[in-house]
Amino acid sequence: MAIQFQERDKIFTLNTEHTSYQMKVDNFGFLLHLYYGGKISGSMDYLLTYYDRGFSGNPSDAGNDRTYSLDALPQEYPSLGTGDYRSSALVIRNADGSECCDLRYVSHEIRKGKYGLPGLPAVHASQEEAQTLEILLEDVTGGVQVRLLYGVLENMDMITRSAIITNRGGEKIIVEKAASACLDFPGGEYEILSFYGRHAMERNLQRQKIAHGNYRIGSRRGASSHQYNPAVMMVEESATEESGRCYGMVFVYSGNFLCEAEKDQYGQTRLLMGLHDELFHYPLERGETLAVPETILGYSGEGFGELSRRYHRCIRKHLCRDICGGQPGPILLN
């Protein structure tokens, strides 16, 4: 099976033909990211490190254990107000004005086929071509539930991610920021490849080092636009077209978007993709839901040329609607 769950250690492993993605639920119920890269066969939880780090706060659950801090641990869907001072995937403003959302694991479901997102574009696949993992997280105090959706297209070497946010509390909340995907990396020197442009000169490649601090690209135009492309690659410094580790994020949405790459004080890197947090304040009354547009994740250990080709194959077959039976389509005037 493409999706496996180890009950004893509470570890999820998502496998494609050449890649693996792994995460675990820890003893406090937090969903931690373990690994994304070339295919593996065992547990990668040995990559989690615990040190007493000054000025990195500890949750009350940890008691006197000063080595446990969300400010340094890799997470699947980090939220503001939990002691993690890096960029957040989710920011909720509660009815009392506070901005805190303490998400803990509740349950999960593994099923055949690819999840859908009503009213939004998304990768599509048959029951035999994909599997879905749905993980339910909840902030018990505020009543916020987040369903993390993972679609695994094994033969395409692609994993899709989305999040559905629901207000189960008694009062209205405001979603101030919502990403669909977050990747945390424990160390290493990386560069980010992005594409900028202007009228009549779109899609210019830019490659730059991810230094300490926060790097952001996005659109506030109401459309993904010619200015920046909602697709990035994060690559090791030595990566070329033919060699090197490369990670990709493609946002399946034509509106405002935001991609962030942040290197923290410990040399860890976080990559986020989702809706732009400026000009975005989404109210949710009790029972209402917000679905965050999908991000397609890709990995290649053979350079960004191979990663590009994997995206091409996946998008042509599973995102574009083929109305011509594989034949060339009619001429389109621009």
Name the predicted role of every residue range.
Residues G298-R310:
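Short, Lys/Arg- and Gly-enriched loop/turn segments at beta-strand edges
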Residues R310-N334:
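An acidic-aromatic substrate-binding cleft motif
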Residues Y21-M23, V292, G329-N334:
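Hydrophobic faces of well-ordered beta-strands that scaffold small-molecule active sites
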Residues F5, K10-T13, E17, Y21, ...:
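Polysaccharide-binding surfaces and accessory modules of carbohydrate-active proteins
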